[in-house]
């Protein structure tokens, strides 16, 4: 068997080929969203986008301490989950903005409820 044919698969103990798992393979959608939100900066990116669309540099200035690499990764994940959209204007210089999708606005309203719950006295 060619080595190249194994790309994207995993060999298990019995040497069977196992199909690659999809990027979002969680059986529980709550677990999937909790995992996404569990990454540092993700909730803050959502919060800042809840006030309106932002360019990459604007977001980075709103989040002191976040690196360009991490911010790009968080935005890519949020776009991949359909929570954020990326728009590019046909202008020079290129103007890219990020904004919440309808799904993202729904998620922010849930995060607002979680914040209200967290602020209640114990």
Question: Predicted regions span which residues?
Answer:
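N-terminal leader segment of winged-helix/HTH proteins
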Residues: 1-37
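N-terminal helix-turn-helix DNA-binding core of bacterial DNA-binding proteins
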Residues: 23-70, 81, 91, 97
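Alpha-helical linker/hinge and terminal dimerization helices associated
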Residues: 43, 81, 110-122
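Residues within the DNA-recognition helix of helix-turn-helix
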Residues: 74
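Basic, amphipathic "hinge/linker" alpha-helix immediately C-terminal to the N-terminal HTH DNA-binding motif
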Residues: 90-113
